[in-house]
Amino acid sequence: MKRVLTALAAALPFAAHAADAISGAVERQPTNWQAIIMFLIFVVFTLGITYWASKRVRSRSDYYTAGGNITGFQNGLAIAGDYMSAASFLGISALVFTSGYDGLIYSLGFLVGWPIILFLIAERLRNLGRYTFADVASYRLKQGPIRILSACGSLVVVALYLIAQMVGAGKLIELLFGLNYHIAVVLVGVLMMMYVLFGGMLATTWVQIIKAVLLLFGASFMAFMVMKHVGFSFNNLFTEAMAVHPKGTAIMSPGGLVQDPISALSLGLGLMFGTAGLPHILMRFFTVSDAREARKSVFYATGFMGYFYILTFIIGFGAIMLVGTNPAYKDAAGALIGGNNMAAVHLANAVGGNLFLGFISAVAFATILAVVAGLTLAGASAVSHDLYANVFRKGATEREELKVSKITVLVLGVIAIILGVLFENQNIAFMVGLAFAIAASCNFPIILLSMYWSKLTTRGAMLGGWLGLLTAVVLMILGPTIWVQILGHEKAIFPYEYPALFSISVAFLGIWFFSATDNSAEGNREREQFRAQFIRSQTGFGVEQGRAH
């Protein structure tokens, strides 16, 4: 039975809408025993790490942040492992395979947000926060309302992203391994819960590090073999690709993915600012000892990811030459077996045989586990730390907070499995787009302005943040993806696919207006406290003990 491959949408924001090249019908593949054996080795090894980590998780700090003992280099690898996905690996390679140069431009969208994190967020975030970004947002503002807003923003992003990951995981594993979709979803959910439940951030970090190393190694080997084929000449690579590609020289020209400039700008803003508002990414900056290590983390992560996306560009052009011209990888109709998303997987077979194909397939599964583990921990910390310990039950003991966190992990895992099964045949591409839009429109403005704008008040942050979140949701529903493609209406009320340009503007304007017009005594007190916060954010004085939030 043919199915639509939605795996790409699981971790490649907006990509399912960007081009026909990255969607299409695929058939379930035969059982890939090499991949299954290699994946089982990975699972056994990472479960061993989880057992090791569980013996070292003795406190709330150990569980949420690995005790702050992760080095900048290790955290950079872990961030890269959390952010680089199997779907971006397969999806961007597929974009290059079908559209050429546009694939490289698209991959840059994933990197442009990181300089913002490096120069504007990482250092101050680490100096002001302890476990979640809500610690920073509520540093001088009212704890209750701000934590509720931050937790809601985090949970909505985590839920949307997690559902998309689970559905994408099931489709991808069915495609690569030949396993039943439901078995794949349950397997991912159970392993995800085990990593986070027993090993916390320490186990999650090492799963992400191992996954990043494996993915970088696999992609490097593929790129090396492609370049070896063309005599390590980029000129030969592009010339040969243009000679055999149906579009010819057009694959070296940009502009084929997003024609409308408004949509292009909105897409770019969503990718850029959404990255800086993802709770599972921001949480990683609390795992290092100080602001210096936080900056190092972003520096290393950006380097690893930049290198990775360059490799996907080479892999995509290699697939044009070695896969697109080989009838063994095509069906009777002349289409790529498994769809265009299988271009990189077929290339793995072309350059390394069945054994390397099994390795790449296992790495693809490992990447999914690394991402969902990070998402689950971020969601659990939002519930246990932000809501339970600081809003609903102030003064809760560490033991009580950790108990709530672990219960939340189980609940999130079960819900993710159930929704993953229920959404099997649904279009979930919009979920990731909406997750990034909310991260960019709610989380990012509050984090940025709470650290940099002295006139921010609780009233402005609350009203502007909720306006940004709701605007992103409403415009996404009224846009072409949901209103037309899913709900079946003839014409979209909101004409653009990507709401970020408008929802981010609403959020910033709302925060500015309602803060500027806030003349309350509480608002004035919050403005006066900015100086103390600024000194702490710059110097890190007192960060070792942490502020009682």
From Swiss-Prot:
Gene3D superfamilies: Sodium/glucose cotransporter (1.20.1730.10). The keyword Transmembrane helix applies. GO terms for biological process: plasma membrane acetate transport; sodium ion transport. The keyword Cell division does not apply. Coiled coil: none annotated. Keywords: Cell inner membrane, Cell membrane, Ion transport, Membrane, Sodium, Sodium transport, Symport, Transmembrane, Transmembrane helix, Transport. It is a multi-pass membrane protein. One of its GO terms (molecular function) is glycolate transmembrane transporter activity. InterPro entries: Cation/Ac_symporter_ActP, Na/Glc_symporter_sf, Na/solute_symporter, Na/solute_symporter_CS, Sodium:Solute_Symporter. Transports acetate. Belongs to the sodium:solute symporter (SSF) (TC 2.A.21) family. This is Cation/acetate symporter ActP.
